[in-house]
From Swiss-Prot:
The lineage of its organism: Bacteria, Pseudomonadati, Chlorobiota, Chlorobiia, Chlorobiales. InterPro entries: Class_I_gatase-like, GATASE, GMP_synth_C, GMP_synth_GATase, GMP_synthase, GMPS_ATP_PPase_dom, NAD/GMP_synthase, Rossmann-like_a/b/a_fold. This is GMP synthase [glutamine-hydrolyzing]. Its EC number is 6.3.5.2. Keywords: ATP-binding, Glutamine amidotransferase, GMP biosynthesis, Ligase, Nucleotide-binding, Purine biosynthesis. It holds the Pfam family NAD_synthase. It catalyses: XMP + L-glutamine + ATP + H2O = GMP + L-glutamate + AMP + diphosphate + 2 H(+). GO terms for molecular function: ATP binding; GMP synthase activity. Gene3D superfamilies: 3.30.300.10, 3.40.50.880, HUPs (3.40.50.620). PROSITE patterns: GATASE_TYPE_1, GMPS_ATP_PPASE.
Length: 513
């Protein structure tokens, strides 16, 4: 399977670049900006893309690629900061612009007398999305300008003449953003026409490739899977089951942090999938270890370690553990942006004890959420399972802010059940990517039946997203929110105030902890 390597210079759009490439039917993966040519060569990409980034190529903190990247014999496309890194490397000059460009801009395609740019084949003058304060002010030798804008005379360039064989291209704007009208066509021109990549990546091809890898990795060893009933672990389990059959045994852990009646619901819908599943009730153990623990990072790590402890009690010569880790989990947990900071450890990634007795099989770790659902459909998993909202590995422990206790978990369960029930009744459940309730560690004064109350505050959260990397808060109807609030306050003892979270990601994360 042919692939594309995206070198990440810290852009907020890096993951979007990878997704757009996959939408063209081409597999893509992200590596750090400073990956060595040897490391890149091991991945055998047929093209390389340099992402945007927040720094300046002439600054002290400049992030620059290894020059050997341009000598690997594959086409290279630089986007925004990536274009500026190309210009600097080949001897051009980049400087701060007196007129910065953020948002829509009109791109004018250059019509060169000698030959048209293959990158701009069938691309007319059109709107593009800019996001830069620096610009190329002197063209590197052996390059030509292929497009311009009002404030950027060199908003696209390519190697030419003596350097034509290098096939190096640069765009000052972002083709991966929807506001760039012909962005998808530009990426197609680069990847399919220039790099000659055959679009052969699809859910079906992914499944075939993963089945081969799983069989090769597991051999004849037994494998255990921690299944939660969520989309990720269910798809991972079914995929591994198709690869190794009865070698796989699943354990569903009731950690005491699940939604209302979750254990019964999960066991019921897992039955038709043909999986071997054991229900392990470890709720007392989890809640004991979480007693008086308020730090979200400590809660995540305790839960991760306890999961492994429970799995180890159910081992029967298994050598491997299956996890439904996704690409966003890996990106958020292990920075690929050089100096950027980790946002938070993921339950599947950072919470595992270092001396775990099991080796990992993570068949979905290179997929985004919507791709997992597509793979699930190809595997024949029912739509009502695939369209369940994401549920965090640590469960309600990260939705009860502060210390976790049975009474507080019960309050949250009842409130969350009402919220989800009303979403489904109103036909809104499938229109939001994720919805849940959060029990806050504060109380507020209220009045009920002419009596003063001092009870808990609950926050409702609903977001719209594609893959969880970015998200907008869902603009649910006011009358709907009023109905949910009224039901919760009247039906759930211990809550006298309901708030609605209108924060987007970024700057907020989807979960509160």
């Amino acid at each position: 399977m042919q692939s594309v390597t995206v070198l990440d210079f810290g852009s907020q759009y890096t993951q979007l670049i990878a997704r757009r490439i996959r939408e063209l039917g081409i597999y893509s993966e992200i590596l750090p900006y400073n990956a060595s040519p040897e490391t890149i060569r091991e991945h055998d990409p047929k093209a390389i893309i340099l992402s945007g980034g927040p720094t300046s190529v002439y600054g002290d903190s400049a992030l620059l690629p290894d020059g050997g990247v341009f000598m690997l014999g594959v086409p290279v496309l630089g986007i925004c900061y990536g274009l500026q890194a190309i210009a600097k490397h080949f001897g051009g000059e980049v400087a701060g612009s007196s007129k910065q460009e953020f948002g829509r801009a009109k791109m004018l395609v250059s019509h060169n007398e000698e030959s048209e740019s293959p990158l701009f084949r069938n691309i007319p003058d059109s709107d593009v999305w800019m996001s830069h304060g620096d610009k190329v002010v002197r063209l590197p030798e052996g390059f030509r300008v292929t497009a311009s804008s009002e404030n950027s005379e060199m908003c696209a360039l390519e190697s030419y003449g003596s350097k034509a064989a290098l096939k190096v291209y640069g765009l000052q704007f972002h083709p991966e953003v929807q506001h760039t009208l012909y962005g998808k066509q530009l990426l197609s021109n680069f990847l399919i026409d220039i790099a000659g990549i055959k679009p052969d990546w699809s859910p079906k091809s992914f499944i075939g490739h993963q089945i081969e890898e799983i069989r090769a990795r597991a051999g004849k060893d037994k494998v255990i899977c921690g299944i939660s009933g969520g989309v990720d672990s269910t798809v991972a389990a079914v995929l591994v089951s198709q690869a190794i059959g009865k070698q796989l045994h699943c354990v569903f852990v009731d950690n005491g942090l699940l939604r209302k009646n979750e254990a019964v619901k999960v066991m019921n819908f897992l039955k038709p999938l043909g999986l071997s599943v054991t229900l392990a009730d470890a709720s007392d153990l989890f809640l004991k270890r979480l007693d008086k623990v308020a730090s979200p990072e400590k809660k995540r790590k305790i839960i991760g370690r306890t999961f492994i402890h429970v799995f180890e009690q159910h081992l029967n010569e298994e050598k491997y553990l299956v996890q439904g880790t996704l690409y966003p989990d890996v990106i958020e947990s292990v920075s690929v942006k050089g100096p950027s900071e980790t946002i938070k450890s993921h339950h599947n990634v950072g919470g595992l004890p270092k001396r775990m007795k099991l080796k990992l099989i993570e068949p979905l770790r290179e997929l985004f959420k919507d791709e997992v659902r597509a793979v699930g459909r190809e595997l024949g998993i029912a739509e009502d399972i695939l369209m369940r909202h994401p549920f965090p590995g640590p469960g309600l422990a990260v939705r009860v802010l502060g210390s976790v206790s049975r009474p507080r978990l019960d309050i949250l369960r009842e409130a969350d059940e009402i919220f989800i029930e009303e979403l489904k009744t109103s036909g809104l459940y499938q229109h939001v990517w994720q919805a849940f309730s959060v029990l806050l560690p504060v109380q507020s004064v209220g009045v009920m039946g002419d009596k003063r109350t001092y009870e808990n505050v609950l926050a409702l959260r609903a977001v719209e997203s594609t893959d969880g990397m970015t998200a907008d808060w869902a603009q649910l109807p006011h009358d709907f929110l009023a109905r949910v609030s009224n039901r919760i306050i009247n039906e759930v003892r211990g809550i006298n105030r309901v708030a609605y979270d209108i924060s987007s990601k970024p700057p907020a994360t989807i979960e509160w902890e």
